[in-house]
Amino acid sequence: MTQDLSEKRWVRSRACSSDGCVEVAHLADGSVAIRDSKEVGKAAHVFDREEWSAFITGVKNGEFDLTVS
């Protein structure tokens, strides 16, 4: 089932100065929606509380850091 997220408050980094940014909306049930600011009409990715927490933990632990050769 797809949620209507059009009325949600979407936020992005203050460092974002164009329409190529990631936007985040926190939902009432604790889940988080993510979308591309240049394609707001497309479906957002929605993650439950546990998935989002695991992602944030991975970011903080460097799990997604790219290595440069």
Predicted segments, located by residue:
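Positively charged, low-complexity terminal tracts
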Residues: 1-69
